[in-house]
Amino acid sequence: MARQKKMGQNVLRAVFFLVLGLLGHSHGGFPNTISIGGLFMRNTVQEHSAFRFAVQLYNTNQNTTEKPFHLNYHVDHLDSSNSFSVTNAFCSQFSRGVYAIFGFYDQMSMNTLTSFCGALHTSFVTPSFPTDADVQFVIQMRPALKGAILSLLGHYKWEKFVYLYDTERGFSILQAIMEAAVQNNWQVTARSVGNIKDVQEFRRIIEEMDRRQEKRYLIDCEVERINTILEQVVILGKHSRGYHYMLANLGFTDILLERVMHGGANITGFQIVNNENPMVQQFIQRWVRLDEREFPEAKNAPLKYTSALTHDAILVIAEAFRYLRRQRVDVSRRGSAGDCLANPAVPWSQGIDIERALKMVQVQGMTGNIQFDTYGRRTNYTIDVYEMKVSGSRKAGYWNEYERFVPFSDQQISNDSASSENRTIVVTTILESPYVMYKKNHEQLEGNERYEGYCVDLAYEIAKHVRIKYKLSIVGDGKYGARDPETKIWNGMVGELVYGRADIAVAPLTITLVREEVIDFSKPFMSLGISIMIKKPQKSKPGVFSFLDPLAYEIWMCIVFASIGVSVVLFLVSRFSPYEWHLEDNNEEPRDPQSPPDPPNEFGIFNSLWFSLGAFMQQGCDISPRSLSGRIVGGVWWFFTLIIISSYTANLAAFLTVERMVSPIESAEDLAKQTEIAYGTLDSGSTKEFFRRSKIAVYEKMWSYMKSAEPSVFTKTTADGVARVRKSKGKFAFLLESTMNEYIEQRKPCDTMKVGGNLDSKGYGVATPKGSALGNAVNLAVLKLNEQGLLDKLKNKWWYDKGECGTGGCGSKDKTSALSLSNVAGVFYILVGGLGLAMMVALIEFCYKSRAESKRMKLTKNTQNFKPAPATNTQNYATYREGYNVYGTESVKI
């Protein structure tokens, strides 16, 4: 009896627990476990990890105030390009009896999935791009960007830009932009980049747009494609100041912007995940501690915004079923879930209740406030607007449906001109004599007082005119500014301006096209050109016959022939002119018949040569022409010798008192033709860029040599180049700006010199960042200083007044000095030679005369022994005398 009573109590207890279990299983028909589906594509690895982790977080952090239910999931992977794979994946989920499906779609799979959901009343929660179509049972976690984009386009006043869009994301934004373009007269160039596989095609598009002078781009793509486009932007160097890129993507911090930010371009984007949100911070703290093997792309990869949307989707699903549980809605699925391919389709009866509950959810997630309209689209959300600066990304404002775009107060970046009086302007410069130098006692000084030089004075004058406070900052890498061909990053002073580390550059910075593209220049404050510096050659030793140098050897030969010609003409004129003949004087006493008669004409051939030589030497002669014709010859010869001797005397003083240096090269052509003397330029400067870009044959040949020379002919600094010139013993030439060349030529040890003319013509300018309001004020200040003549005064002060080589010192190739024996040695040689020749001729004359006199004495003795009869025929004697005069063999009296 007792046993039967005990058995009855056990049965009642079993029935009680059975009823209790049934009540527990169905709180108003609500199950303990909610099964949800997951559809993932290939490139959603991190999103899959976030999906599983979010479910795990919910199951381990349930609200104890309500009867808990667990979330369970079934995951399928689909190939969006295969419609059978998409259908099979969805039907697999539906056959498992899932209450809702989370998943991704693209342009190819969207219609298939949404059609199944609408036909079978199965809710599909997705973080994929939103659609404008009014589809049922699709809950879109991703907010629409159309309104935010149009607001920013109006805020930045874009009237001409390029729109690069992904066709997989739909055409809704394209349509909205084109409608706005018609209303606002915008010039929009739209290009679809969704189907581009070759990265070279992106490059060609950017190059084409750049030829059209396009500087503004709106890029509407997923993160991966945006990264690819920006990579080509960096390669082409289109990420410098003046370019503006607006990224129509909700994951601004997911995009790789490290390389782009160094270019100076303005980059604007949108961010749906607020990293300052405590929920986000708490999630990330747990996220980074996950096991990478169980949750791929969790620990070592930053959290994507699509992963945050995935987490929020689980919150929405959980909140919807909590609501259904509170409302005691029966959502239990009993029996078979049915066939998704049945014809006609058999929808799930509780699907409408679940869809309605999902759309009624309002919860705070990692992406902010989450609400939906009647079509399952996000509403009442806020999107942060970010801007990328050289210092990093910053939040510039926010956008919502009611206030539109709201910029933060500090986003109104100070116009340099408006705030310049209240802040200290950073003036970047470079240590380069005589532009900027340390003072001798600079260690005892502070601030700008430590420096001196041309640019130091120029910066002071500009600041005085513009009325700004400034501090000088020496560029860290010691370079003027060039863009790296691989990274496209600017270095030197140009980089300081491009990346916002300086406000003005006052330095010997050459105005070039590539620099003008990224920074602004004032009018040139100094004109110059590329010049050649060589080591000053040794002074040439004067030759023995250097006194002949004032006249070319051709002139000396002409003078010799002219003298001979004049002598011959004078001889002939004297022969034919009757006024050059002497008349016989009958009153004279008869001479010795043995002595030769006096010649009646003094200008024989030897006397004519003597006359021309005496006139040329400006010493005169004891005979002169008597006839008019002879005097004409003498007059023109005297005039000729006057001009020649005067010119010779004028040049002789310069040639004998000036020491000349023979330069091995005189021009760039000389450098290009030879191989003994190496030549190079400053590395990373405008001079090197000039040769690299030049199309002139001579300069192309020089560039080909310089870039292949071993060891390298490029120097890091100008001082290194000058030192190399001085140590090379004339075997290295340095190509640099003419102003620097002239300055170094005036500095000790005065052993360099500038040769040839300038290879080009350019100027130094004061540089400011692109678009800086300081640019106009600085430009006006430079023009005013030029008109006042202050720029010339500064150059004279630092180039010549402080020169160390004297007036004209090292800057002159010729140096006047006292004559040395070597200058006039040839004259002494000729004197000694002439004296020796005279003594030799005198000896010959003496010997000849002695021999002739001996013969005459013998003849006289013979004559005395034989006395012939006196001459009776005087007529014959006269005839003899006349013939002697005409054909006489002697022209000089003895």
From Swiss-Prot:
TM helices/strands, residue ranges: 553-573, 628-648, 824-844
Q: Record's family? A: Belongs to the glutamate-gated ion channel (TC 1.A.10.1) family. GRIA3 subfamily.
| UniProt-listed SUPFAM superfamilies | Periplasmic binding protein-like I, Periplasmic binding protein-like II, Voltage-gated potassium channels
Q: What else is known?
A: The postsynaptic actions of Glu are mediated by a variety of receptors that are named according to their selective agonists. This receptor binds AMPA (quisqualate) > glutamate > kainate.
Q: Which residues lie within the membrane without crossing it?
A: 603-618, 619-621
Q: What's the superkingdom here?
A: Eukaryota
Q: Which SMART domains match?
A: Lig_chan-Glu_bd, PBPe
**GO MF annotation terms:** AMPA glutamate receptor activity; glutamate-gated calcium ion channel activity; glutamate-gated receptor activity
**Disulfide cysteine pairs (residue numbers):** 91-340, 750-805
Record note on quaternary structure:
Homotetramer or heterotetramer of pore-forming glutamate receptor subunits. Tetramers may be formed by the dimerization of dimers. Interacts with PICK1, GRIP1 and GRIP2. Found in a complex with GRIA1, GRIA2, GRIA4, CNIH2, CNIH3, CACNG2, CACNG3, CACNG4, CACNG5, CACNG7 and CACNG8. Interacts with CACNG5. Found in a complex with GRIA1, GRIA2, GRIA4, DLG4, CACNG8 and CNIH2.
Enumerate the glycosylated residues.
63, 266, 380, 415, 422
- UniProt gene name: GRIA3
> Gene3D superfamilies under this entry?
1.10.287.70, 3.40.50.2300, Periplasmic binding protein-like II
Which PANTHER family does this chain map to? IONOTROPIC GLUTAMATE RECEPTOR
Query: By what name is this protein known?
Result: Glutamate receptor 3
| Known function | Ionotropic glutamate receptor that functions as a ligand-gated cation channel, gated by L-glutamate and glutamatergic agonists such as alpha-amino-3-hydroxy-5-methyl-4-isoxazolepropionic acid (AMPA), quisqualic acid, and kainic acid. L-glutamate acts as an excitatory neurotransmitter at many synapses in the central nervous system and plays an important role in fast excitatory synaptic transmission by inducing long-term potentiation.
Q: Which residues form the signal peptide?
A: 1-28
